[in-house]
A protein has these predicted regions:
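ATP-binding N-terminal substructure of ATP-dependent carboxylate-amine bond-forming enzymes
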Residues: 1-126, 138-146, 396
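ATP-dependent carboxylate activation and anion-phosphoryl transfer catalytic cores
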Residues: 7-23, 48, 71-73, 104, ...
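Structural detector of well-ordered beta-strand residues that form the stable sheet scaffold
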Residues: 29, 79, 101-103, 131, ...
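Short secondary-structure boundary/hinge segments and terminal tails
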Residues: 38-39, 87-88, 113, 140-142, ...
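Methionine-biased hydrophobic packing positions in alpha-helices, especially
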Residues: 110-113, 123, 156, 168, ...
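A polyampholytic, Gly/Pro-enriched intrinsically disordered region
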Residues: 122-131, 152-154
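Catalytic beta/alpha-barrel core
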Residues: 134
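Acidic/histidine-enriched active-site and ligand-binding environments that engage anionic O-linkages
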Residues: 146-156
Length: 448
């Protein structure tokens, strides 16, 4: 087992990893930028190393600084969390070269699944249902036109190196294809340094349902049930739940088997997520695979009583998994609390938290790194907390969430708490009748 793990991240996920390491008797090293000197992960770790100024590309994305921090503290493994370098094949490779275990996917796997067109081709070989569309990357606009005609409108252009909704364009008719092709490629080039595109049939008003998997170094994989991530704004998830209100026992079995088949086909090692689009007829199609821990992993932990971070560490240390699949025994909901103003287009709201009262009680979990007096820097992602409620039924979990949101007081900055309060009262949400298009029609109402 590892003696010391460096956590190459910040915020709540860094704190989350540190807590599990402490429970396992593993020493921890925090890294931080100048802007994060007062962050809780720095205070809770056994050691802490400043790796640069506030800008991410000079600190949390600076591979040489992170490797140097690992070497001077004699860390024998690095946990990348999510975001930043968690799906960076070069970072994974450099860790290998320095004799440091990367607690995540291999560089080859990150490359293979990170290229969306390649990932889709691989899933087809594994026998996993995929959305109809191009066979790999589209080289020219002429090929793009022919593929769209063959696939049938509407279609979706997607960046092969994409993520977070960047480089994606829905095209409803052929007259709009050229503009979409040009703008998607430009956006992809700017965001990822790569303008490769592929095309899929546009699945109208789908649900986005992901399957959590774990694979070990002995060729075995298992799934830990699903998460419904359909409520999104600009392809960014806002809230998630498990089980999905749209799920049936038969569909869960099929999707779980497909995810395990995919993982074992590629000999996947570590925690990962296979994301699917599910249409109104409950047909499901492979969307992408995330080769890291997900933001929303706590709701899975809550319903199956399982520490995913601990399992990641054990698998990285060569421990075999049990190989059994896990099914949800309860219902869990997560609301992402962001430092944003929901009444002003979700504009970021960095600044100093003057007052903070955390919710509590049975079935309430709060994953956060903020506290009263903490200043939220403008340099990073705006998520400051994850509020999770768990109960025997979905109705009870919603009631718990409403109560917890009412208890949650953050002053000094704007947050998305008012949005989540209104979401929990929305008839379509209460009915479980929502798709990825839900936010297009959602209007947040002013409060007194």
């Amino acid at each position: 087992m590892f003696k010391k793990i460096l956590v190459a991240n910040r915020g709540e996920i860094a704190l989350r990893v540190i807590r599990t390491c402490k429970e396992m008797g593993i020493q921890t090293v925090a890294v931080y930028s100048n802007a994060d000197a007062e962050s809780l992960h720095v205070k809770f770790a056994d050691e802490a190393v400043c790796i640069g100024p506030a800008a991410s590309n000079e600190s949390y994305l600076k591979i040489s600084n992170i490797i140097a921090a690992a070497e001077i503290t004699n860390a024998d493994a690095i946990h990348p969390g999510y975001g930043f370098l968690s799906e960076n094949a070069r970072f994974s490779k450099i860790c290998e070269e320095h004799g440091i275990k990367f607690i995540g996917a291999s560089p080859e796997m990150i490359d293979r699944m990170g290229d969306k067109a390649n990932a889709k081709a691989t899933m087809k070989l594994a026998g996993v249902p995929c959305v109809p569309g191009s066979e790999g990357v589209i080289e020219t606009f002429k090929e793009c036109q022919l593929t769209a005609k063959k696939t049938g409108y509407p279609v979706m252009l997607k960046a092969s190196a994409g993520g977070g909704g960047k480089g994606m364009r829905a095209v409803w008719k052929k007259e709009d294809l050229k503009d979409a092709w040009d703008s998607a490629r430009q956006e992809s080039k700017a965001a990822f340094g790569n303008d490769d595109m592929y095309m899929e049939k546009l699945i109208e008003e789908p649900r986005q349902i992901e399957i959590q998997i774990i694979g070990d170094s002995h060729g075995k994989a298992c799934h830990l049930s699903e998460r419904d991530c359909s409520i999104q704004r600009r392809h960014q998830k806002l809230t998630e739940e498990v089980p999905s209100p749209f799920m049936t026992t038969a569909l869960r079995k099929k999707m779980g088997e497909a995810a395990v088949k995919a993982s074992e086909f590629i000999k996947y090692e570590g925690a990962g997520t296979v994301e699917f689009l599910v249409d109104k007829h409950r047909n499901f199609y492979f969307m992408e695979m995330n080769t890291r821990i997900q933001v929303e992993h706590p709701i899975t932990e809550q319903v199956i009583n399982f520490d995913l971070i601990r399992e990641q560490i054990l698998v990285a240390a060569g421990v075999p998994i049990l190989g059994k699949n896990y099914l949800p025994s309860m219902h869990s909901i997560e609301c992402r609390i962001n430092a944003e103003d929901p009444f002003n287009g979700f504009r970021p709201s960095p600044g100093k938290i003057t007052t903070l009262h955390s919710p509590g009680g049975h079935g309430v979990r709060l994953d956060t790194h903020v506290y009263a007096g903490y200043s939220i820097p403008p340099n990073y992602d705006s998520m400051i907390a994850k509020l999770i409620t768990t109960a025997q039924t979905r109705e009870e979990a919603i009631h718990k969430m409403k109560r917890a949101l009412d208890e949650f007081v953050i002053e000094g900055i704007k947050t998305t708490i008012p949005f989540h309060r209104q979401l929990m009262d929305h008839p379509e949400y209460i009915a479980g009748n929502y798709t990825t298009k839900f936010m297009e029609d959602f209007e947040i109402k002013p409060t007194n």
